[in-house]
């Protein structure tokens, strides 16, 4: 994650990105928050949510929607249907 730091990615965003990269599943924002708190106990839900939006806008993560269910986040940006 050091190279991300040199690009101006905060430690909070690095933690959120790490959680998503380490997961084998599509995570909701709440799930990302739960995992990120293990890496950075003081991180807030708002910070996680804003980090997810930033990382998505920078094309570092993908956003997956399954109908009316909660939005989920994925490290894999290639299209895949379930």
PLM feature spans:
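Short alpha-helical segments that sit at the start of domains
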Residues: 1-18
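Short capping segments at the starts of secondary-structure elements
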Residues: 22-28
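Basic amphipathic alpha-helical segments that dock to polyanions
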Residues: 48-58
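A short acidic, leucine-rich amphipathic alpha-helix
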Residues: 31-37
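Short coil turns linking two alpha-helices in DNA-binding domains
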Residues: 44-45
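Non-DNA-binding regulatory cores of transcription-related proteins
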Residues: 60-82
């Amino acid at each position: 994650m050091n190279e991300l730091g040199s690009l101006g990615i905060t430690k909070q965003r690095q933690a959120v990105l790490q959680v998503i990269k380490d997961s084998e599943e599509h995570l909701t924002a709440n799930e990302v928050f739960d995992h990120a708190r293990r890496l950075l106990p003081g991180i807030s839900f708002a910070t996680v949510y804003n980090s997810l939006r930033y990382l998505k806008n920078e094309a570092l993560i993908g956003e997956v929607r399954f109908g009316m269910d909660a939005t989920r986040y994925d490290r894999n940006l290639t299209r895949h249907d379930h």
